[in-house]
């Protein structure tokens, strides 16, 4: 049994249900596979960047891109430290997240991509175009989290091995990406779906799952609460449906993700109790969030917006919070211990409010 967000994930370009203009553009790219450039897809979370990547590959290579396996690759640093990275692969592509290696992401770029790029692809018997395009695609998740050294290594790889490899980079923001990489890629923006588009998609899921719906207003409320994040809206719908035995009423409360509720509680603690003991309690909450694999930058972003929504704070306090958030967001990208910087942000905010 899979989550609805996976069960109803489109697997082809024709199955995509929103942003038709972008879908048609991707179809035009798949019509000329030999001329496929390096791609950089950017946009907010939950807008379907990864889904569109896989749909594009399916259009080029066929259904074989969904024959996935997970390998664990080992890398050795200059200090003889062994590191492991999960690599998702099919006969036609690889999917990696080098930022999981922290400041050692350059090693992944230099060794893994170089190894893949130096091997000419010949097993294309199941692809739609036979042997017409002998290259392998590499999807790089969280490209905006790559260090400058890794991006420099990536630039050299793109220049030297463009014949045998195509890079598809996925990121939330383009600002951390260096200019030489952006200039070598086709930039594709994936905008967030509108509330009406999300409501339409949720309505299709409701029909397929045979959920009893009192009124469609509940779907609009879910779409508004998701802030344009289609993934979150599907998870919220599934949680509400299971909690209410597949019967949703107009009075049914919107169930937000637990980690967001925890951050909102953390915000109230920061505003009401500004003390050393309170800071220690906040540290325990941060540890819990990080242990549940909530990215540190997402925690910082949600905490910042939650603090800005507090009505009792004046304009001076809010401007200081924004300034501190930008400072610690940069430090998160430079450091290895996220807990230090998140706790430092909370301490700064507490001092600001006193």
Curated annotation (Swiss-Prot):
InterPro entries (UniProt xref): AAA+_ATPase, DNA_pol3_clamp-load_cplx_C, DNA_Rep/Repair_Clamp_Loader, P-loop_NTPase
Domain of life of the source: Eukaryota
GO BP annotations, alphabetical order: DNA damage checkpoint signaling; DNA repair; DNA-templated DNA replication; leading strand elongation; mitotic sister chromatid cohesion; sister chromatid cohesion
Keyword DNA-binding among UniProt keywords: yes
Gene Ontology, cellular component aspect: Ctf18 RFC-like complex; DNA replication factor C complex; Elg1 RFC-like complex; nucleus; Rad17 RFC-like complex
Gene3D superfamilies the UniProt entry points to: 1.10.8.60, 1.20.272.10, P-loop containing nucleotide triphosphate hydrolases (3.40.50.300)
MF-aspect GO terms: ATP binding; ATP hydrolysis activity; DNA binding
Binding-site residues for ATP, renumbered to this chain: 5, 17, 43-51, 231
Primary location: nucleus
Keywords, sorted A to Z: ATP-binding, Cell cycle, DNA replication, DNA-binding, Nucleotide-binding, Nucleus
Alphabetized SUPFAM superfamilies for the sequence: P-loop containing nucleoside triphosphate hydrolases, post-AAA+ oligomerization domain-like
Localization, UniProt: Nucleus
Note, other: Present with 5040 molecules/cell in log phase SD medium.
Family the entry assigns: Belongs to the activator 1 small subunits family.
Subunit structure comment from the entry: Replication factor C (RFC) is a heteropentamer of subunits RFC1, RFC2, RFC3, RFC4 and RFC5 and forms a complex with POL30/PCNA in the presence of ATP. Component of the RAD24-RFC complex which consists of RAD24, RFC2, RFC3, RFC4 and RFC5 and associates with the checkpoint clamp DDC1:MEC3:RAD17 complex. Component of the ELG1-RFC complex which consists of ELG1, RFC2, RFC3, RFC4 and RFC5. Component of the CTF18-RFC complex, which consists of CTF18, CTF8, DCC1, RFC2, RFC3, RFC4 and RFC5. RFC5 interacts with ECO1.
PANTHER family assigned to the protein according to its UniProt record, in alphabetical order: REPLICATION FACTOR C / DNA POLYMERASE III GAMMA-TAU SUBUNIT, REPLICATION FACTOR C SUBUNIT 3
Function according to Swiss-Prot or TrEMBL: Component of ATP-dependent clamp loader (RFC and RFC-like) complexes for DNA clamps, such as the POL30/PCNA homotrimer and the checkpoint clamp DDC1:MEC3:RAD17 complex. During a clamp loading circle, the RFC:clamp complex binds to DNA and the recognition of the double-stranded/single-stranded junction stimulates ATP hydrolysis by RFC. The complex presumably provides bipartite ATP sites in which one subunit supplies a catalytic site for hydrolysis of ATP bound to the neighboring subunit. Dissociation of RFC from the clamp leaves the clamp encircling DNA.
Name of the protein described by the UniProt record: Replication factor C subunit 5
Naturally occurring in which organism (per UniProt): Saccharomyces cerevisiae (strain ATCC 204508 / S288c)
Gene coding for it: RFC5
